[in-house]
């Protein structure tokens, strides 16, 4: 079963925020994640496997820091498996990444409120 072993951990912002300037870091994370999720949606609509692969690679490094990269690993395995992934499996994997992206954005905005308007 593809779901076995998947962890649904909440993103962890502690490493990101350890550099200081928390409000700015959270704003940047939110803005960049929103752009990346839009690019992912567009690549999926175009059935652009190369684009999906490039975005997956790009997102993995930042999401690993947040300990939120599990959906990206699922998508990566699908894109790099034998043959062409079926559309339903690909849609499911992309949805997992989009859902995690939405969670990162939501939690980053919640965390951002702790730091006021500065």
Regions from the PLM with identified roles:
Residues 1-118:
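Two-component system phosphorelay core
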């Amino acid at each position: 079963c593809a779901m076995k072993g998947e962890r649904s951990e909440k993103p962890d912002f502690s490493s990101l925020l350890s550099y200081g300037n928390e409000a700015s870091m959270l704003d940047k994370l939110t803005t960049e994640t929103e752009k990346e999720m839009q690019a992912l949606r567009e690549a999926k609509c175009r059935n652009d496997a190369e684009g999906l692969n490039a975005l997956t690679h790009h997102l993995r490094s930042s999401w690993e820091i947040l300990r939120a990269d599990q959906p990206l690993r699922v998508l990566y395995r699908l894109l790099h498996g034998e043959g062409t992934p079926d559309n339903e499996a690909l849609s499911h994997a992309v949805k997992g990444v989009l859902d995690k992206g939405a969670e990162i954005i939501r939690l980053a905005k919640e965390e951002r409120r702790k730091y006021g308007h500065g």
